[in-house]
Amino acid sequence: MIADAADSARLSQLPLAEFIFGSTSGMHEVRKILEGALEDDLPVLIEGESGTGKEVVARYLHVHSERAGGPFVRVNCGAISSRLLDGEMFGQDSAASGSVVLAANGTLFLDEIAEMDSALQHKVAHALKTGQVRNGSSVNARIVCATSVDLTGAVSGASPGLSSHFEHRVRLLPLRERKQDIPQLCEYLVEKFARNFGRTAPRLKPQVLDAFQQWNWPGNIRELENWIARIVIFGTEETMGNEFRRQTAGREGVAMARHHALRLNAGRMRRTRRQV
């Protein structure tokens, strides 16, 4: 998947302080790491739960790099079987170009790298370490990887030492760990969707913001985006605010339990896929 030109143009105009904002110490650390990643061409590992914005960060690194004129090629490692993924990345044979070749002079974004089997992870680790692929040719692309699990954790299924090959490693915080940033995020998202949909930007009432800050957002920023988009599109903040409170009332524990269950199930699926 190659980045949309409109998205790239929009991201290229944003300074880092406006792209990654927030007052928590964790967000300050994110900005610090990304500042370093913007100064070189070395591999980057982006960690974070689903919905925290890993791909957007990868795209931001691309459009603010010297490779911005090249392609941004995304490979969803969790959507393809390991056998097909090998060919997708490195080519079926010498005559077939894989994603590594297609990303030449640009950025190769490997999403959910922990979904790969160990053999393919070793190939990626080799490329990260030596800058070459199995046929001896050079990798002429910046490699940015993302994962929703801790690569050093026992349930990740990642090859030992894989994470050590990344010069830059950044963890995007789940929204529940940066609730004080929610009002600022809401303001940004309201303006964004109002501009995209040609609507007047509503001013969110304190009651709505309070309700947003009390919720733990298992879907993270993506879930918040969905609610803000609905408020902007339908133009009924009070109605949507009441709907939000109705849907989330008493569901905090259920939502978080479901979130953790899904993560555990994903780990089991990875182990099963390797055994097949």
Put a short name on every predicted segment.
Residues 8, 12, 18-22, 29, ...:
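Bacterial helix-turn-helix/winged-helix DNA-binding modules and their immediately adjacent linkers
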Residues 95-98, 161, 188:
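A general alpha-helical scaffold signature found inside nucleotide-binding enzyme cores
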Residues 158-175:
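A short helix-turn-beta junction within AAA+ P-loop NTPase domains corresponding to the substrate/partner-engaging
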Residues 1, 44, 53-54, 59, ...:
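Bacterial C-terminal helix-turn-helix
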Residues 69-71, 164, 178-181:
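Short acidic capping loops at alpha-helix termini that bridge into adjacent secondary structure
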Residues 62, 90, 125, 163, ...:
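Conserved protein kinase catalytic domain
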Residues 5-138, 142-154, 175, 194-237:
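AAA+ ATPase active-site-proximal loops
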Residues 1, 103, 113, 133, ...:
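Generic low-polarity alpha-helical segments
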